[in-house]
């Protein structure tokens, strides 16, 4: 996918920097409220251990569920109206919803607002689509890998900042601070992102069937969507049991929260280091090779996690797993760029986001169910089997793909 001369004039490198900053701010904004979400649910009147766990799970998951539903609509609108306006819509919409969340008076209002947050989201997939349609094809892996580190960085710093802010100012003010971060993202995007987009009338838009027929390899694209979902399932399945597993490994120690936080964070740090480098390597040797190698590496790391005896052994393995994970989504996104045209980029990336959100909902449910029935260690083995299935499925799809042609 080669950019036009007008894209060169736009300066895609500057757009990449600004989009990275936007992904960082939205990633931080989303994760700022995560550390105290159950506490806020309790403040809104939910009492009792079981009810609190249930409502905390519902308000967490509903955002991803509604994001999965809304993403294709926003992707189609981005292909018609442009990606910059979708970035602005997302940042502004989420900022307003965050303000309203800070004013919620009961759990039902909060639940509706969490659903609305999912409906109005979509900054990251539209940022991916914007950069993918402007960057030279031979730099796609590096550019998308670099862009992915923005959201990861924000998600790493957000919980730390959110916890500190909640301790100093209380729970509700953090929502207003989060809204101000999103408004800053809106202003930066408005002033600094440049896009020359020719709006397409609704009549000229390709319908879903035509989108599928326009793909060089629909089967491969579908397999990439499934891969995205499984990546998130594998990541999310471990999240609900990580702290409890660390406690089981550590025994009676006083700083279990600190140890758990460190082990939870190290994959993100590793992904920050690996994503641009492996993306650049993918530009040289092919993102398909990077994808398969990273998936195999993930399986080889997940299996021993089930047999570790100390938290530090788990931490080392999770750091290495994070390095592999840093290559996965950028490799998928680069392959999507190679196998679709600029005309449908918004929808392709939004469909991919929908599968990612489905994985975000499914993963924690799977992990919780397995651990409840078979114990913590079984979660890692089952997750390894799921990723192994994905290796076989992806390998088969990549092996059958046609010779790539440049579209766009």
UniProtKB/Swiss-Prot annotation:
It is found in: Cell inner membrane. It is a multi-pass membrane protein. GO terms for cellular component: plasma membrane. The keyword Zinc does not apply. One of its GO terms (molecular function) is transmembrane transporter activity. The chain crosses the membrane at residues 16-36, 58-78, 92-112, 115-135, 146-166, 173-193, 224-244, 253-273, 290-310, 319-339, 378-398. InterPro entries: MFS, MFS_dom, MFS_MdtG_subfamily, MFS_sugar_transport-like, MFS_trans_sf, Mutidrug-R_MdtG, Tet-R_TetA/multi-R_MdtG-like. The keyword Kinase does not apply. CDD domains: MFS_MdtG_MDR_like. GO terms for biological process: response to antibiotic. Pfam families: MFS_1 (PF07690), Sugar_tr (PF00083). Keywords: Antibiotic resistance, Cell inner membrane, Cell membrane, Membrane, Transmembrane, Transmembrane helix, Transport. Belongs to the major facilitator superfamily. DHA1 family. MdtG (TC 2.A.1.2.20) subfamily. Confers resistance to fosfomycin and deoxycholate. HAMAP family: MFS_MdtG (MF_01528). This is Multidrug resistance protein MdtG. It comes from Escherichia fergusonii (strain ATCC 35469 / DSM 13698 / CCUG 18766 / IAM 14443 / JCM 21226 / LMG 7866 / NBRC 102419 / NCTC 12128 / CDC 0568-73).
